A protein has these predicted regions:
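Alpha/beta-hydrolase fold nucleophile elbow
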Residues: 122-135
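C-terminal catalytic histidine-bearing segment of alpha/beta-hydrolase fold enzymes
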Residues: 175, 222, 227-266
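Short beta-strand/loop motif that positions the catalytic acidic residue
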Residues: 195, 202-204
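Cap/lid segment of the alpha/beta-hydrolase catalytic domain
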Residues: 23-24, 29-112, 119-120, 165-169
């Protein structure tokens, strides 16, 4: 599907058995991780490659959801021969910066176009669309959430890196996390809080070095205040799993599909 003139996103659409235009189902956009594996994108959540832990798209399809797995910019089929791996990601980030934009802007746009595409599919219940992501995919999820009102329910797994934590720990994080100028107004949890009053679940590992836990604990309080102010305190939940790192544990996945069951299917 086209996201901008001349820019098309390769994606995989998973339609569960028994779902069709006469029996539509809720849908989930699944945003893949980064992990420095630029050769992997949509194929990992779709269950065709990568770590079975992150075959989440096919797992959701087996639970009855229509699932869209797109490639993020710089990954899998959205790479170029001239620049490989992190070089292309750095090039794209700087290209957007000098244009007054950033990769976060581009990722938000692409995800909104993914929802546009789902809007053309009669197999999808149009009022029941969600978003899930792990790691970079989590960042894409809570970044896109405020600007995509068609998302009824969102789940982010293992990624809420605050700029305060990045500066305190001298953490060299991936480019899609950075929005030029934003830190003078707030931090990343303030963005996630704009999703209120729609349903948002965030899972964290206590020992995840990519999201220093000290700032995560403060960040979820910021988000909770935003939900309380929107009279939607029950629509936000989070869990910090003791002893876990940057993973999708069995318990994290259990909370994820229960959240979708509650807010997309119920």
């Amino acid at each position: 599907y086209e996201v901008e003139p001349g820019d098309r996103v390769p994606a995989l659409l998973l339609v569960p058995e028994g779902v069709d235009t006469k029996s539509p189902a809720p849908a989930v956009v699944v945003c893949h991780q980064h992990n420095g594996q630029w050769h992997l994108g949509k194929s990992e959540p779709a269950g065709l490659a990568g770590n079975p832990m992150h075959h989440t798209g096919v797992a959701l399809a087996k639970l009855g959801y229509v699932v869209l797995c797109p490639d993020a910019l710089c990954f899998e089929q959205r790479r170029i021969e001239q620049l490989r791996g992190g070089d292309y990601e750095r090039f794209e980030f700087l290209r957007y910066v000098v244009s007054g934009k950033c990769m976060a802007w581009k990722n938000i746009l692409d995800i909104r176009r993914a929802v546009d595409y789902l809007g053309t599919r009669r197999e999808v219940q149009q009022d029941r669309i969600g978003c899930y992501g792990h790691s970079m995919g989590s960042t894409h999820t809570w970044l896109a959430g405020p600007w995509e009102p068609r998302f009824r329910c969102l789940v982010g797994n293992c990624c809420l890196p605050t700029y305060a934590a990045i500066h305190r720990t001298h953490l060299l994080h991936c480019f899609p996390n950075f929005i030029p100028g934003w830190f003078q107004y707030g931090d990343t949890p303030d963005i996630a809080g704009l999703i209120a009053p729609r349903a948002l679940l965030l899972n964290f590992g206590e020992n995840d070095g990519g999201s220093p836990i000290q700032e995560v604990r403060g960040g979820v309080k910021t988000i909770a205040r935003a939900y309380a102010a929107a009279n939607a305190a029950d629509k936000f939940n989070y869990d910090i799993e003791p002893g876990s790192g940057h993973v999708l544990s069995d318990e994290m996945w259990k909370r994820t599909h229960q959240w979708f069951q509650r807010h997309l299917k119920a």
